[in-house]
Amino acid sequence: NSNVEGKSDRISLDSSYLALSNDLYWLNILLGGSYTWSESSVVKSAKISELKISQFYTGAQINLLGSFWQVSLSQYINYAAIQNLLVDPPYDEVHMFKGDFSAVSRIPHWPVYGLIASSWQHAVQEDLAGALTFSTGGSSSVRGYEPGFANGDDGYHYNVEAHYNGLNAW
């Protein structure tokens, strides 16, 4: 037990603009930002972090659609301004590249489908604030592990899954 407690609040605004589309694909332009403030301290002792983070991102997402498959690819460029009130100098700036990919396909007339999903992050700087690190764990990345069981400045993960959906209770 580390006796550390903290809180974090975040407000964000995300937008998507449909730039191109037809029956086989669509392209979205993405733009957004967020503001996060968090603090943590050793219980009944000293404050160990107090952060204010402003983030902005822009990117694109392309979706391709076939008769029995769909592919989605997103790429973002992120900028974050960090104010750490407990260090000197208290200001830092970070640039990151983030993305994700997913593909799903099914076999016609079979109750089987497959899924591939991945995400990545590359940060130009090192030693990112915890709120900006690439984190894995939980049901959306590494199943069976607690959310955030591993994190770092750069990261990549992928899932390959096969699903059977042919069981009927009645």
Language-model features, listed with the residues they occupy:
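Gram-negative/organellar outer-membrane beta-barrel architecture
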Residues: 1-69
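C-terminal outer-membrane beta-barrel translocator/porin domains of Gram-negative envelope proteins
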Residues: 39-170
